[in-house]
Amino acid sequence: MSAAARVLPKAVTFVTGNAKKLEEVRAILGSSIPFQSLKLDLPELQGEPEDISKEKARMAASQVNGPVLVEDTCLCFNALKGLPGPYIKWFLEKIGHEGLNNLLKAYEDKSAFAMCIFSLALGPGEEPITFVGKTAGKIVPARGPNDFGWDPVFQPDGFEQTYAEMPKSVKNEISHRGKALALVKEHFASASYTVQSDNSA
């Protein structure tokens, strides 16, 4: 795509109002990508997860007038053909962990996958680039600390612990978010973006 390194007018803005999510992203990215965080009220869209993510990135880029990274997370139950999917946040708010388990009560298949989509838009009017991470697992009765979304009910394949029970370092290594951010990191390393310094200390 490009030979010369792209100079970004300012650090990438990661759009989130979720402190736990921000903490996790900071832990995974470290200092590899200069970014700041900002809570924006973007309309909640419906559609395919990747399309939703791209559209949110476009809207955010025009609001901040610069490069943005937005994230969308889905929890997809195979027995329900991928639902709740991108609507997991509302399902969780309305019916809680027990309700999520009850959705699968009539089904033998408790398998699910967690999916994370990051969309990077380098500025207003730029086509967003998406990075997708997936982790397969199953839905179980809630176990572990109850302070981060649906982590207590998702047990990744190959592990005896739910996301909530795992040490953060282990979760970040294998999670849908960790996998998507590894691709974001890779992209930044190969694209050689540099952030324009304005010399204001």
Swiss-Prot record:
UniProt: Mg(2+) binding residues: E44
Q: Which reaction does it catalyse?
A: ITP + H2O = IMP + diphosphate + H(+); dITP + H2O = dIMP + diphosphate + H(+); XTP + H2O = XMP + diphosphate + H(+)
Give the signal peptide as a residue range, or say none if absent. none
Q: Which cofactor does it need?
A: Mg(2+); Mn(2+)
Pfam families from the UniProt entry: Ham1p_like
UniProt binding sites for ITP: 16-21, 56, 72-73, 89, 148-151, 171, 176-177
| One example GO MF annotation | XTP diphosphatase activity
- What does the cofactor section's free text say about binding? Binds 1 divalent metal cation per subunit; can use either Mg(2+) or Mn(2+).
Keyword check for rRNA processing, yes or no.
no
* E.C. no: 3.6.1.66
One GO BP annotation of this record: nucleotide metabolic process
Task: Keywords in alphabetical order, please.
Answer: Cytoplasm, Hydrolase, Magnesium, Manganese, Metal-binding, Nucleotide metabolism, Nucleotide-binding
Q: Which GO terms describe its cellular component?
A: cytoplasm
Per the similarity annotation, which family is this?
Belongs to the HAM1 NTPase family.
Record protein name field = Inosine triphosphate pyrophosphatase
